[in-house]
Curated annotation (Swiss-Prot):
GO biological process, one term: innate immune response
Pfam entry (one): Cecropin
Residues carrying Isoleucine amide: I61
GO CC aspect terms: extracellular region
Tissue-by-tissue expression: Highest expression in fat body and hemocytes. Is also expressed in Malpighian tubules and to a much lesser extent in midgut. Not present in silk gland.
Primary residence: secreted
Protein source organism: Bombyx mori
Domain of life where this protein originates: Eukaryota
Function noted in UniProt: Cecropins have lytic and antibacterial activity against several Gram-positive and Gram-negative bacteria.
Keywords noted in UniProt: Amidation, Antibiotic, Antimicrobial, Hydroxylation, Immunity, Innate immunity, Secreted, Signal
Signal peptide coordinates: 1-22
The protein's name in its UniProt record: Cecropin-B
Chain residues in the propeptide: 23-26
PTM annotation: Lepidopteran-B differs from lepidopteran-A by its hydroxylated residue.
Length: 63
């Protein structure tokens, strides 16, 4: 009888620890979408930098 109580207590302890240690997956991914948009904008600005410099120098030569 005592062994059954100890076994059930250990089982309940393991069950409780396994439920609390698992990290839930975030349900709202809106911040990841905002971060991706910001990354795309930043990359677009970095890629457009040399083209803007060429246009500026061509405009200066044309004057």
């Amino acid at each position: 009888m005592n062994f059954a109580k100890i076994l059930s207590f250990v089982f309940a302890l393991v069950l409780a620890l396994s439920m609390t240690s698992a990290a839930p997956e975030p349900r709202w991914k809106i911040f990841k979408k905002i971060e991706k948009m910001g990354r795309n904008i930043r990359d677009g600005i970095v890629k457009a930098g040399p083209a803007i410099e060429v246009l500026g120098s061509a405009k200066a030569i044309g004057k």
